[in-house]
């Protein structure tokens, strides 16, 4: 199952944390696309914004699930956009199984009660997926969706 791993990528810590999580996903038979591990083509002369959009949008469109890192006082704006794109694509594509968000940041409290995270973005996640508090929970959910995808393929 192809998974798009959305999350903030602006600090060394953020990139290392996402890469570390991706290693665990791969060790569990999952196939995450991690944007910073997939560099843009050096001969592409378009603007950085256009290259980033095209590369990441294509990866989102090809993915069967999304994992979104939503730690911090606010959901990263790029991550929120990617969540919205995947949610919209899910409405017409039965091979897309859902969005699982990883929120293990105790500073922002519980997922549903008084949390300052954007309600619209959280609503997108909750309508088609789940918010997990640990990477282990994330892996369980992604494996369940992977099993569902395999059953769907066998039924065709």
Residues of each region from the PLM?
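Conserved catalytic or regulatory cores that recognize and/or transform ribose-phosphate-containing ligands
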Residues: 1-156
């Amino acid at each position: 199952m192809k998974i798009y791993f959305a999350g903030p990528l602006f600090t060394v810590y953020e990139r290392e944390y996402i890469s570390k999580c991706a290693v665990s996903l791969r060790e569990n038979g999952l196939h995450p696309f991690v944007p910073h591990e997939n560099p843009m083509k050096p001969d592409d002369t378009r603007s950085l914004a256009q290259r980033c959009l095209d590369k990441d949008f294509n990866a989102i469109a090809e993915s069967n699930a999304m994992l979104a890192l939503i730690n911090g006082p606010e959901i990263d704006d790029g991550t929120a956009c990617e969540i919205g794109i995947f949610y919209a694509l899910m409405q017409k594509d039965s091979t897309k199984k859902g969005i699982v968000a990883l929120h293990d940041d105790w500073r922002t409290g519980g997922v549903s009660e008084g949390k300052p995270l954007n309600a619209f973005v959280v609503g997108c996640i909750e309508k088609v997926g789940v918010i997990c508090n640990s990477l282990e929970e994330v892996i369980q959910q992604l494996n369940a969706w992977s099993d569902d995808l395999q059953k769907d393929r066998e039924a065709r």
